[in-house]
Amino acid sequence: MRKYTVNVSGNAEFGRSQKNKSETEIFENIDQLDWYAYDDNFGTSEEKYLVRAIRELMNDLQEKWSDIYLLRNDKAVKIYSFDEGRAFEPDFILLANDKKVGNTSWQIFIEPKGSQFLDSNNTFKNSKEGWKEKFLLQITERDEARTLLDDERYRIVGLPFFNNEMSREVVNSNLKDL
């Protein structure tokens, strides 16, 4: 049985164009974002806030990376948790090449997550989606320890869930520190 949430305020973002000011409260001039791989974003509010957050960070990211692209993963990439082998399709993949370390490519998994998935402690840790965030963080741990891929030319990273109100600053900080 599926559960549906009805937004009585009428401000649900899913299905609305992010580049159309009359349709969205989270407008971005998508046509000017050469790093965003699509013509528009019809995603959830958290997905739109992620695009905005990346835009605001782009100057910092371009100082260390080139060829930066944010891709919406729509069933193209499926990854499997280390603990139980559960399938997971992160909503976004940020790809980049390192300017300072020569021929190093970055692949960063990002999952925007709405507040409806928070647990009773206002975190995602013990929510039904918590295993996904744990897995994303395990990817980063294994990348840093070089147990995921023993090759300095490739970096595979998972970020904590992105939520505009709860974790935006943590995700921003993690991206800056990579």
Region annotations inferred by a language model:
Residues 1-178:
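Intrinsically disordered, low-complexity, repeat-rich regions
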